[in-house]
Amino acid sequence: MSEQELKALRVRIDSLDEKVLELISERARCAQEVAKVKMSSLAEGEVPVFYRPEREAAVLRRVMERNRGPLSNEEMARLFREIMSSCLALEQPLKVAYLGPEGTFTQAAAMKHFGHAVISLPMAAIDEVFREVVAGAVNFGVVPVENSTEGAVNHTLDSFLEHDMVICGEVELRIHHHLLVGESTKTQSISRIYSHAQSLAQCRKWLDAHYPNVERVAVASNAEAAKRVKGEWNSAAIAGDMAAGLYGLSRLAEKIEDRPDNSTRFLIIGNQEVPPTGDDKTSIIVSMSNKPGALHELLVPFHESGLDLTRIETRPSRSGKWTYVFFIDFVGHHQDPLVKSVLEKISSEAVALKVLGSYPKAVL
C-alpha cells in the first residue's frame, strides 16, 4: 500500500471520528433532556429513577443483534456500555458499592456492568455492601454469588437471609489469574505467593507443577496480595489485570487458572423492581417443612410447568436447628403468568417464600 493510499484512509478515519464525536455528543445532550423531563414530571416527594436495568439490557441486546462486525458483539456492546455510562452520569452519577478493596474481581464486575463513569465504593465485607444499599447510601451493590470452580459464595446467600433486598441484575466475569511480581522481585528467589484462598485453590495444579515448595499465603483479597508484593523482593501474587494495573505489577506467568472456563457470577443488588425484558431470570428463597419429600414437593411445580431451573443451593435456616432454606434461580420473570402460577403453588406448600427479584439475564 502506497503512502498516498494510507493518507487517504487516515483522512477518511478522521472524518468518521468527527461524525462519531458529534453523534456521541448529541446522545449526551439527549440524555440531559431525559433527565429534565423526569425531574419535571415528579410528584411531590417522589425520587427520580435514572438507571433502568431493563432499558440498558434492551439497548445492549439490540446493539449485539445489529452488529455486523468486524468488531465482536461483546466488544461493540462494551463500547456502548461506556457511552451509556457517561451519558447516565450527566443525568445522575450512580454510587455503587462492591466487595473491595480496589483491584478485586468484584470491582472489575462492577465496571463491566455499569461502565467506568460511576462512583465506585469498596467495602470490607459482603455484609457491608448489603447494609450500604439498605441504608440508601449507594444506588446499587455488586456481590459475588457463585464460581464455576468453587461453587456458591455462602456469605452472599446468608446476607439475603438477613436483609430485604432486590436483585436488579447479574454479570458474569471470566476469571483469569496471573502470577504477578514487582520491579524489585528476584524471580529466581520467590519463596512466598500471596492470594485469596479461592484463587489459590483455582490455581492449585499449576502451583503444584511450577512452585511446589513455595509457601502459599491466603490473604483477604487478590488486591491485598498485589499490594503486599509491591514492597517485597522475594514474593509474588496471584491476581487479575485490574490489581496488576493498580499496583504497577508485571505478569511473570499469564492465565494460570486450572480451568480455562473459570468464571464468577455476580449479582447487582438494589431497592428497585425491574420490569420484564422478555429474557429474564428470577431468584427466590424457599423454606419447606422438615419432612420426607419436601424437596420433591418444591420441584414438582417447576417440572410440570417446564420452567428452566438454573441453580439451586441449600443453606441452614436461621429459624431452627437442622432446618434449611433453598435458594433457587430460574428462567422467567415473576410478573409472567406462568411464573406467577408456579410461585402460587410453591407458596401453598412452603413455610415461607421470598422473591429476591427478577432481572435481565447477563448481556455481557
Task: Show which residues each predicted segment covers.
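Domain-level signature for soluble enzymes in the chorismate/prephenate branch of the shikimate pathway
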Residues: M1-L364
